[in-house]
């Protein structure tokens, strides 16, 4: 939206069609989500939107390739694109930047164990324009390609533009036994290694200490 509204950018028809845009960028057939490095860019007046996005795309591809080449051994990720997808989830889950390696570690451990990721941002992305700001139990049960409660593994595409920090966190997750996390309500999270500990954290942070309100879930 910011790019489309910028007065010094020359707008082209390619920007309105994802297939045409990605072909222009040398990635035909690729979904555009996640492929543009988020940063502050300086560019001359008269730059076309495709030229601008080509630059952001090239930086993302370079950063992703560099991080992939230096990744930790044994990650449950087959391709750089899978790492990009997971990094986009970490980006959406991490309001506190220092928690990114921990959040990445939880998801990496879940993938290793064959557990579903069960992360709300993917569900919200899959809901598209039907999301009204509230996510309900029925939304978590409604199957879409992006619902990581109903489907195992990663969603089919990134769900956001991951920062360099989130990409690095996925390639170098924290050393932890944590398999769960829950919001403390201040942007940070409580991490748990066991379901019982996670249940207690949910009751404490989300349910005001009222155990009778707990309905399960991961």
Language model features: what each stretch is:
Residues 5-12, 20-218:
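Bacterial extracytoplasmic/cell-wall-associated proteins, especially those involved in peptidoglycan
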């Amino acid at each position: 939206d910011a790019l489309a509204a910028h007065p010094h950018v020359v707008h082209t028809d390619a920007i309105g069609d994802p297939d045409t845009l990605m072909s222009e960028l040398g990635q035909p057939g690729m979904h555009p989500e996640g492929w543009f490095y988020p940063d502050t860019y300086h560019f001359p007046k008269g730059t076309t939107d495709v030229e601008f996005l080509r630059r952001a795309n090239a930086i993302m591809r370079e950063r992703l390739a560099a991080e992939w080449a230096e990744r930790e051994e044994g990650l449950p990720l087959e391709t750089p694109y899978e790492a990009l997808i997971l990094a986009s989830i970490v980006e959406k889950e991490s309001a506190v930047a220092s928690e990114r390696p921990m959040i990445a570690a939880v998801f990496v451990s879940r993938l290793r164990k064959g557990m579903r990721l069960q992360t709300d941002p993917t569900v919200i992305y899959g809901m598209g324009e039907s999301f009204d700001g509230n996510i309900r139990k029925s939304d978590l049960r409604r199957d879409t390609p992006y619902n990581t409660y109903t489907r195992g593994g990663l969603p089919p595409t990134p769900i956001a533009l991951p920062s360099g920090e989130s990409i690095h966190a996925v390639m170098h997750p924290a050393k932890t036994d944590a398999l769960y996390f829950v919001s403390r309500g201040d942007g940070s999270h409580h991490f748990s290694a066991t379901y019982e500990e996670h249940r207690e954290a949910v009751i404490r942070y989300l349910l005001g200490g009222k155990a009778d309100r707990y309905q399960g879930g991961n």
